[in-house]
């Protein structure tokens, strides 16, 4: 069986990870007063986004762990990176998607109409500006929308999910866009 992986990467005009072109140590980079680099990673369900995020986080240093808020969360954090799962920006919980009057036959969470685009755009913009945000949580276990969690920016902030480049405001705030295209026989 031949597995085909395609990785498409694009940089926003003028984007840079660190000021200038000099190489600095990890500790020096952490102490620099720079705005976070914001990365969007898009891929279909089952393509390995979460696995890719854990490995990417380990490359940038630090062990990724779930944000410790005493309940279920999808947010991975380390000294250098914060990974935010865009599932957290679902507009409705599982029950709401099944019984929504706008969608009498129900609607899947994968549909673009099921996303909180305004909140997502505001959080991306605020984190890029170095501000702390209170972001929603979609609980995959219960299918409910849990109370918000507080997320502080790190030098690298990654938004991963199906649609990080769909909304013009979110896409404009991304310094780097990555699309993972995995063949169906490799997924899951």
Which residues fall in each region the model found?
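Short beta-strand-centered segment that lines the nucleotide-binding/catalytic pocket of NTP-utilizing
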Residues: 62-94
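ATP-dependent NMP and nucleoside kinases share a basic, alpha-helical "lid"
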Residues: 146-188
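N-terminal chloroplast transit peptides
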Residues: 1-21
């Amino acid at each position: 069986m031949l597995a085909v992986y395609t990785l498409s990467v694009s940089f926003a005009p003028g984007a840079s990870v660190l000021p200038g072109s000099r190489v600095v140590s990890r500790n020096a980079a952490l102490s620099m007063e720079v705005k976070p680099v914001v990365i969007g990673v898009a891929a279909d369900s089952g393509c390995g986004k979460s696995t890719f995020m854990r490995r990417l986080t380990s490359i940038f240093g630090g062990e990724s762990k779930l944000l410790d808020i005493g309940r279920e969360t999808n947010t991975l954090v380390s000294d250098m990176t914060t990974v935010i799962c865009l599932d957290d920006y679902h507009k409705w919980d599982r029950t709401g998607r099944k019984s929504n009057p706008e969608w009498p036959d129900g609607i899947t969470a994968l549909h673009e109409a099921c996303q909180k685009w305004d909140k997502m755009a505001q959080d991306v913009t605020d984190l890029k500006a170095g501000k702390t945000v209170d972001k929603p949580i979609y609980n995959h276990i219960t299918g409910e929308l849990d109370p918000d969690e507080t997320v502080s920016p790190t030098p690298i902030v990654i938004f991963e999910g199906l649609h990080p480049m769909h909304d013009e405001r979110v896409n404009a705030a991304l310094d780097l866009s990555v699309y993972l295209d995995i063949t169906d026989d490799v997924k899951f």
